[in-house]
Amino acid sequence: MIDRQTNEPKQKTRIILAPMQGLVDDVMRDLLTRIGGYDECVSEFVRITHTVHSRSIWLKYVPEIANGNKTFSGTPCTVQLLGSDADNMAANALEAVRFGANKIDLNFGCPAPTVNKHKGGAILLKEPELIFHIVKTLRGRLPAHIPLTAKMRLGYEDKSRALECACAIAEGGACGLTVHARTKAEGYEPPAHWEWIRKIRDSVNIPVTANGDVFSLQDYIGIKTISGCNSVMLGRGAVIRPDLARQIKQYENGGPVKDTDFAEVSKWIRQFFELCLTKEANNKYPLARLKQWLGMMKKEFAAAQNLFDRVRTVKDADEVRNILAEFEREMNT
């Protein structure tokens, strides 16, 4: 197959669903990978402190472990760890592997203040020596056949140590690196600095995955062109536009790109709510997750605002079920 941009033979592109704490849990991973287009997804981070987690904790955060490390659609799922104590992280990684995990990712990018306050996530970008120590320790203790990867931002306050941190990850023994093209201080404010991903890609000898501000097919083409990466991770854009990965795969496969409409999205919404109820029917989780998702999709679909307004004050699951079914009928007539 020929690349549409370069007219050269096309290299295989990988699309990965990002780990997003409190947003892309196992239910959202299940739904989005069913919709299609993903080659891999990464779990929400499992926080590592002073204890070694039991099997029940691993399955709580990454139930895919019990399904051969795959979502129900068959998409591989990687276990992500967050922490700063190399020995405890290694001990927990070994336990995760003992329970069935077959790939480990390390979080050096989470910008949440509460996480950073406890020396986790992006705060470690101030200490590339510690990053190297963590990666090297885990690589040394994990079985050789277990891939070890990492995700980082461009820095904490600024980008002055971005290349140093990336090299620490590569030299520590990671076999892959995902780069979110902002610093912690920049949060999610545009723009994402895709050109910095290329700088990092050119500085390390491991594959780099590009991440940041991919909300459309054109964004995907842009980040891939500027970064030079053949692997792209989708974050908020995947939730706001549930068919984004599917569109990208249609484009990469040379076929027509089909834009979804809200009639199709309404089916996914109802399916998502049922999956949430299956997971936790007796608390606020299903309603909270539904409203969270609709609140995000309002940016892309005007009809999402209409549906959000209908369910916003409803607290009964059966009433929400009826509203979703009625809305889906309206969308398909």
From Swiss-Prot:
tRNA-binding keyword on record: yes
Keyword Flavoprotein listed: yes
Residues the record marks as site: Interacts with tRNA: R47, N107, Y188, R289, K291, R312
Disulfide feature: none
One term of GO molecular function: FMN binding
Coiled-coil boundaries: none
Keywords, ordered alphabetically: Flavoprotein, FMN, NADP, Oxidoreductase, RNA-binding, tRNA processing, tRNA-binding
EC number of the protein: 1.3.1.-
Record-listed FMN binding positions: P19, M20, Q21, Q80, K151, N211, G212, D213, G235, R236
PANTHER family from the UniProt entry: TRNA-DIHYDROURIDINE SYNTHASE, TRNA-DIHYDROURIDINE(16) SYNTHASE
Name of the protein described by the UniProt record: tRNA-dihydrouridine(16) synthase
Organism: Neisseria meningitidis serogroup B (strain ATCC BAA-335 / MC58)
Organism classification: Bacteria, Pseudomonadati, Pseudomonadota, Betaproteobacteria, Neisseriales
